[in-house]
Amino acid sequence: MARKQVSRKRRVKKNIENGVAHIRSTFNNTIVTITDEFGNALSWSSAGALGFKGSKKSTPFAAQMASETASKSAMEHGLKTVEVTVKGPGPGRESAIRALQSAGLEVTAIRDVTPVPHNGCRPPKRRRV
């Protein structure tokens, strides 16, 4: 039985000048998503997707690498300026923002949108090492 030829869709290059970089920095990983102003994703990257495993995912260097790869692929769509929204308490917050700037994107605003509970769920118990 012959296999059907499937035509793959080529990635369309959009011409978007300014967007939003969403940095989600948890204790275990850092995820960087770059969207246009309406929230449609242009590119994304994470420390785990780059091959960092285990505790190496939660390092500032892994966040820097994730931010660089996401910004490079977003700049192929013509992106020049970004607003940055940072969510979470992780160690990769500052290094991810610095990597966006060093990759050639102009950061216009930095916004911290970390969710703060008004005494909601009980937090996880303290670690005893």
Curated annotation (Swiss-Prot):
GO molecular function: rRNA binding; structural constituent of ribosome
GO biological process: translation
InterPro entries from the UniProt entry: Ribosomal_uS11, Ribosomal_uS11_bac-type, Ribosomal_uS11_CS, Ribosomal_uS11_sf
This protein's UniProt keywords: Ribonucleoprotein, Ribosomal protein, RNA-binding, rRNA-binding
GO cellular component terms attached to this protein's record: cytosolic small ribosomal subunit
Transmembrane segments: none
Family: Belongs to the universal ribosomal protein uS11 family.
Function: Located on the platform of the 30S subunit, it bridges several disparate RNA helices of the 16S rRNA. Forms part of the Shine-Dalgarno cleft in the 70S ribosome.
Subunit architecture: Part of the 30S ribosomal subunit. Interacts with proteins S7 and S18. Binds to IF-3.
Listed name of the protein: Small ribosomal subunit protein uS11
